[in-house]
């Protein structure tokens, strides 16, 4: 059924956003309609057996994948944004990137107590963003049932930070 080698559609950008980092650019995959469709279909397959109410995803590329998956799976979508981007009252978490510190914000009423959540993002690198997303979901009373990523940078050992969670990835480096 699935036929594409999706790794072919990921472009390596050396020394971006800073020297020593190899950025895995998914825009060629997004640009190709067959690759994008197959990536979404395959990511949905990764979580077909999980029961959840909402897909939570961070900007920017997480929005693209998360919203598409939420639509395909018939679930609600919750955007998580950088500071100052959401119009209503928010709660936030700080986290470390492999190249700095950032904050993630979510509307304080985005998740109801007890709702089950799938977290979606484009790349699982250090696990810092995923940890912050988990903390946000828990802060609002939600339960993270799974995390799904298009790409995992296994050489950074991100799963160590996510022990105890169901982590699914499509492409592993």
From Swiss-Prot:
Matching CDD domains: PRTases_typeI
Pathway given in the UniProt record: Purine metabolism; AMP biosynthesis via salvage pathway; AMP from adenine: step 1/1
EC number: 2.4.2.7
InterPro entries in UniProt: Ade_phspho_trans, PRibTrfase_dom, PRTase-like, UPRTase/APRTase
Enzyme class: transferase
Keyword Cytoplasm set for record: yes
GO terms, biological process: adenine salvage; AMP salvage; purine ribonucleoside salvage
MF annotations from Gene Ontology: adenine binding; adenine phosphoribosyltransferase activity; AMP binding
Reactions this protein catalyses: AMP + diphosphate = 5-phospho-alpha-D-ribose 1-diphosphate + adenine
Broad class of the protein's primary localization: cytoplasm
Function summary: Catalyzes a salvage reaction resulting in the formation of AMP, that is energically less costly than de novo synthesis.
Family label: Belongs to the purine/pyrimidine phosphoribosyltransferase family.
Assembly mode: Homodimer.
Protein name as annotated: Adenine phosphoribosyltransferase
Organism expressing this protein natively: Thermotoga maritima (strain ATCC 43589 / DSM 3109 / JCM 10099 / NBRC 100826 / MSB8)
Lineage: Bacteria, Thermotogati, Thermotogota, Thermotogae, Thermotogales
């Amino acid at each position: 059924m699935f036929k594409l080698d999706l790794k072919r559609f990921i472009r390596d950008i050396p020394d971006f956003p800073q020297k020593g980092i190899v950025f895995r650019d998914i825009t060629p995959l997004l640009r190709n309609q067959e690759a994008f469709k197959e990536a979404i279909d395959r990511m949905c397959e990764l979580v077909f057996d999980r029961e959840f109410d909402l897909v939570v995803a961070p900007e920017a590329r997480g929005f693209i994948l998360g919203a598409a998956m939420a639509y395909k799976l018939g679930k609600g979508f919750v955007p998580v944004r950088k500071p100052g981007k959401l119009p209503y009252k928010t709660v936030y978490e700080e986290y470390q990137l492999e190249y700095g510190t950032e904050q993630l914000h979510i509307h304080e009423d985005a998740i109801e107590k007890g709702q089950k959540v799938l977290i979606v993002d484009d790349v699982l690198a250090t696990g810092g963003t995923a940890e912050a997303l988990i903390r946000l979901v828990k802060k609002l009373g939600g339960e993270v049932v799974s995390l799904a990523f298009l790409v995992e940078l296994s050489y950074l050992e991100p799963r160590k930070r996510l022990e105890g969670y169901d982590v699914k990835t499509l492409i592993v480096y």
